[in-house]
Structure formats: structure tokens, C-alpha cells
């Protein structure tokens, strides 16, 4: 499974990149707004940090012409830019346009297997089903991931699943067990994946025992 980080915070991206496990970045208007910085400043910082990894940048328009205009502008910022497009009728048309012209797309805000199927039929490079938001309304987000994976296995679609709206380490583990291609993870959840209470206890015990070793070389 590939690990993307879901943030526009350059410090979080750098920290994740230093772990040598980062495979890409996803952003959205909300995450960029949280930085309090101008849009282009944020984007250029991110692209400079991960020039060889896919970075999803979302269009702000909801109409076809606007999506094309904004997507083409964003695509010029780097070869690793992926145009993030909402799951709408106009969005599907835009996906077809971009993919035909060699620009990768990520269809976002997917909440049903039917939406995922349409996005894959349109040729999306990536599809982003939101598990946490489904869990919030008493649906089972991971069931959606399993259904999408089955559709891909049945028909051989090339689209990759980006499990989005991840809230906790279990979401990542469940996505991996299902066979999703990618999880896009907030930095705080990446940090949580590292930790286990028995690991902490083991380190504490080893350090205590080490103190009793005579003539330590270091």
C-alpha cells in the first residue's frame, strides 16, 4: 500500500517525507485555507518538497469550463500534479478531457460504489472514497472500499483507490487488508501508526536493563 499525506501544511509534509515512507500528497481548498497563506505560495512549497511524487490539487470551479481552465493552469505547475475533481456530471466530463490530454485526475467526494464506477469508466487515474464521513452518518466506510475493490477486480479498471477521510490507524489497517492501493493520511494518524504501548514498555525495559551492563562501549 502507498501512503499519501492529506495536508497542505509544509512542515507536516517535510516530517512525513523524512520518514522515507511518503508516496504522495493530497490537498483540498479547506486544507489550504487552514495554512492562512496565499494559494500559490502553498502549492509551490509542496511541489518543491516532493517534486517526484503525485500531488493532488483541487479545482475550485464546479462547472466544466471552469474546471478545465483551472485544471490546465494547475497542471502547468509540475509534471507530478494530479487534478482533483469533484464527483459531478461536469466533473466526469472534465476527467475525460484531462485524461485524454495526458493529465492525471483524482475524483474526490465519492460516497457510493456507483459513483466510483462512473469515475473509473471516465478514466480517472485515482478515485477518493471518503470513509470517515460515511462512518459519521452511521454507514460503514470500509464496506464501500471493499465494494470498489471488487469492481476493479471484476473488470480490470486501472484507477487506483485512494482511501480518504481517514480518522484513525484502524482505517489504514482495514484499507490495507481489503487491498486498497493508497491511503491518504493526516499527519497525526501517521504518528499514531508508529506507537504501541507494548513497544513503549519494551524500550523502557531495555533502557533500564542497559544501565546495569558493565563497561558499556557506548
Swiss-Prot record:
It holds the Pfam family TAL_FSA. Its EC number is 2.2.1.2. The keyword Transferase applies. PROSITE patterns: TRANSALDOLASE_1, TRANSALDOLASE_2. It is found in: Cytoplasm. Pathway: Carbohydrate degradation; pentose phosphate pathway; D-glyceraldehyde 3-phosphate and beta-D-fructose 6-phosphate from D-ribose 5-phosphate and D-xylulose 5-phosphate (non-oxidative stage): step 2/3. GO terms for molecular function: aldehyde-lyase activity; transaldolase activity. The active site is at residue 84. Its main location: cytoplasm. GO terms for biological process: carbohydrate metabolic process; pentose-phosphate shunt. The keyword Transferase applies. Keywords: Cytoplasm, Pentose shunt, Schiff base, Transferase. Disulfide bonds: none annotated. Coiled coil: none annotated. InterPro entries: Aldolase_TIM (IPR013785), TAL/FSA (IPR001585), Transaldolase_3B (IPR022999), Transaldolase_3B/F6P_aldolase (IPR004731), Transaldolase_AS (IPR018225), TSA/FSA_arc/bac (IPR033919). It catalyses: D-sedoheptulose 7-phosphate + D-glyceraldehyde 3-phosphate = D-erythrose 4-phosphate + beta-D-fructose 6-phosphate. GO terms for cellular component: cytoplasm. Transaldolase is important for the balance of metabolites in the pentose-phosphate pathway. Belongs to the transaldolase family. Type 3B subfamily. This is Probable transaldolase.
Amino acid at each position: 500500500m502507498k501512503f499519501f499525506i492529506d495536508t497542505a501544511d509544509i512542515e507536516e509534509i517535510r516530517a512525513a517525507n523524512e520518514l522515507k515512507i511518503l508516496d504522495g500528497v493530497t490537498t483540498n481548498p479547506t486544507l489550504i485555507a487552514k495554512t492562512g497563506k496565499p494559494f500559490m505560495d502553498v502549492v509551490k512549497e509542496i511541489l518543491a518538497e516532493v517534486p517526484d511524487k503525485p500531488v493532488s490539487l483541487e479545482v475550485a470551479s464546479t462547472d466544466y469550463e471552469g474546471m478545465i481552465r483551472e485544471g490546465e493552469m494547475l497542471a502547468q505547475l509540475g509534471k507530478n500534479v494530479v487534478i482533483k475533481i469533484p464527483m459531478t456530471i461536469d466533473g466526469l466530463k472534465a476527467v475525460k478531457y484531462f485524461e485524454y490530454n495526458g493529465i492525471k485526475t483524482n475524483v474526490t467526494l465519492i460516497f457510493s460504489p456507483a459513483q466510483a464506477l462512473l469515475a473509473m469508466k471516465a478514466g480517472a487515474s485515482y478515485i477518493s472514497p471518503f470513509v470517515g464521513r460515511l462512518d459519521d452518518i452511521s454507514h460503514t466506510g470500509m464496506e464501500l472500499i471493499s465494494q470498489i475493490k471488487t469492481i476493479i477486480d471484476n473488470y480490470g479498471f486501472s484507477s487506483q483507490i485512494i482511501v480518504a477521510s481517514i480518522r484513525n490507524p484502524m482505517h489504514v489497517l482495514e484499507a490495507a487488508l481489503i487491498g486498497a492501493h493508497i491511503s491518504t493520511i493526516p499527519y497525526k494518524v501517521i504518528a499514531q501508526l508508529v506507537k504501541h504501548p507494548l513497544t513503549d514498555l519494551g524500550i523502557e525495559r531495555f533502557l533500564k536493563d542497559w544501565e546495569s551492563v558493565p563497561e558499556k562501549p557506548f
